[in-house]
């Protein structure tokens, strides 16, 4: 790491320690993500290196740039563009109120980043407010894109914090192993509701069972009628027939009817029925975004 001066530790990410650093040559501030691998004896898997090389090609204003990959001994250090805060910290600064224009701008940027990455056949698989970063001029950027495929999604973070289930779709909670872009669209829906409610999570489940119950109590329990092949999923088990008791206008009171319509198109239990990022960007909710 001869080219970088470490300034301070920013935190513990899902995959390892993150430092704020300065590029000695250019003076630019960057984020260094040091990836810890489960089996250090093995070194860095070639599959991980292949995936990471793909990520270097992702260049979009709503995706955090991966500038460089430094591979030494058993360590892999990823050099990313630096952002001041994540969406979770941004929520903390709001005092419980998010104005409609800011909410729409954040969601628009999230979907633009997703659309770009999905067009390049890269999934995120672990979207949450902690890996949506915001820089000083209010641009939202998706971080950690593709790392789940390169390194797997661990059950626990490097810091022993449990990886959250709050943004996982029902198909994944039921053990689905074949992912497509729909996994990210569900997460985007959960984040959309959280943005609208100024940081209050939509489905804050304690474990897989509680997570599924919370989802089905709001959306209604799925069945073979509205989700063919649900019973074939590896960890499927039947749940009671839940009927929603709260309306969407009660759950996201700050979201207008167009926003609620988009939210319901994102939060479809059957992955085949979920709206994709491009269609979401064409939704009427974004029709009046000349101000964004």
UniProtKB/Swiss-Prot annotation:
Residues involved in Mg(2+) binding: 131, 144
CDD domains: STKc_CDK5 (cd07839)
A GO molecular-function descriptor: metal ion binding
Gene Ontology BP term (one): positive regulation of protein transport
Keywords per UniProt: ATP-binding, Cell cycle, Cell division, Cell projection, Cytoplasm, Kinase, Magnesium, Metal-binding, Neurogenesis, Nucleotide-binding, Serine/threonine-protein kinase, Transferase
Cofactor binding remark: Binds 2 Mg(2+) ions.
Catalytic EC class: transferase
E.C. no: 2.7.11.1
Reaction catalysis annotation: L-seryl-[protein] + ATP = O-phospho-L-seryl-[protein] + ADP + H(+); L-threonyl-[protein] + ATP = O-phospho-L-threonyl-[protein] + ADP + H(+)
Catalytic residues as annotated in Swiss-Prot or TrEMBL: 126 (proton acceptor)
Entry protein name: Cyclin-dependent-like kinase 5
Naturally occurring in which organism (per UniProt): Caenorhabditis elegans
Gene name, Swiss-Prot/TrEMBL: cdk-5
């Amino acid at each position: 790491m001869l080219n970088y001066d470490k300034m301070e530790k920013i935190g513990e990410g899902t995959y390892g320690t993150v430092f704020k650093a300065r590029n000695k040559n250019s003076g630019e501030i960057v984020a260094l993500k040091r990836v810890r691998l489960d089996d250090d004896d093995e070194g860095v898997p070639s599959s991980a290196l292949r995936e990471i090389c793909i990520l270097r090609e992702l260049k979009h204003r709503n995706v955090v740039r991966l500038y460089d990959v430094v591979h030494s001994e058993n360590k892999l250090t990823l050099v990313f563009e630096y952002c001041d805060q994540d969406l979770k910290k941004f929520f903390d600064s709001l005092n419980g109120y998010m104005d409609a224009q800011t909410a729409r701008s954040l969601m628009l940027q999230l979907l633009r980043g997703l659309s770009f990455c999905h067009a390049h056949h890269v999934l995120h698989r672990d979207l949450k407010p902690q890996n949506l970063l915001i820089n000083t001029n209010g641009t939202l950027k998706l971080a950690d894109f593709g790392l789940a495929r390169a390194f797997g999604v661990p059950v626990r973070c490097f810091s022993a914090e449990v990886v959250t289930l709050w943004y996982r779709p029902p198909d994944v909670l039921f053990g689905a192993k074949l992912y497509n872009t729909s996994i990210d669209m569900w997460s985007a829906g959960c984040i959309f509701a959280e943005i609208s409610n100024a940081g209050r999570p939509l489905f804050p489940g304690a474990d897989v069972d509680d997570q599924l119950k919370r989802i089905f109590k709001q959306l209604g329990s799925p069945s073979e009628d509205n989700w063919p092949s649900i019973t074939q999923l590896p960890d499927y088990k039947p749940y009671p027939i839940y009927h929603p008791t709260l309306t969407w206008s009660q759950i996201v009171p700050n979201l207008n009817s167009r926003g609620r319509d988009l939210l319901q198109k994102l939060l479809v239990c059957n992955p085949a029925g979920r709206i994709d990022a491009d269609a979401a960007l064409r939704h009427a909710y974004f029709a009046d975004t000349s101000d964004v």
